[in-house]
């Protein structure tokens, strides 16, 4: 019985720490500042197209304009690679800035 409790406790701690790590990734306030560059082409407060699609509710959508599912990894790849008129930002933004930007996009 003691072994079961220890294993259960360890599993719970491991799961909890994983959730905390993923929740801590990116800072939406910093991401809002990064978004200033994106706002030239994207509306943050509606879905109307500027040069690129409006991004309000972006993470609530099933798919991005390229047909891929809206996930952190796919959004980061889109930021890195660009496409459909969007420039690639792989070498222009740090990984931390991309994480911050993604955190901000989740608030829209």
Report each predicted region and the residues it spans.
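Post-cleavage N-terminal segment of exported redox proteins
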Residues: 1-28, 78, 104-108
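Short, flexible active-site loop motifs that bind/organize anionic cofactors or intermediates
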Residues: 21, 65, 88-91
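Short, conserved sequence motifs enriched in acidic/basic residues, glycine, and aromatics
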Residues: 25, 69, 92-93
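Gly/Gly-Pro-rich "capping" loops immediately C-terminal to redox-active cysteine motifs
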Residues: 28-33, 43-77
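The canonical Cys-X-X-Cys-His
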Residues: 31, 35-44, 101, 105
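Axial heme c-ligation environment in periplasmic c-type cytochrome domains
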Residues: 49-60, 77-108
């Amino acid at each position: 019985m003691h072994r079961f409790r220890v294993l259960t406790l360890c599993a719970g701690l491991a799961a909890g720490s994983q959730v905390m790590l993923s929740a801590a990734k990116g800072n939406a306030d910093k991401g809002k500042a990064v978004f200033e560059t994106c706002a030239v082409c994207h509306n943050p407060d509606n879905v109307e197209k500027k040069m690129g699609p409006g991004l309000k509710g972006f993470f609530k959508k099933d798919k991005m304009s390229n047909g891929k599912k809206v996930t952190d990894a796919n959004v980061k790849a889109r930021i890195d690679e660009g496409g459909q008129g969007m420039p690639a930002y792989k070498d222009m933004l740090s990984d931390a800035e991309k994480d911050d930007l993604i955190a901000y996009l989740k608030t829209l």
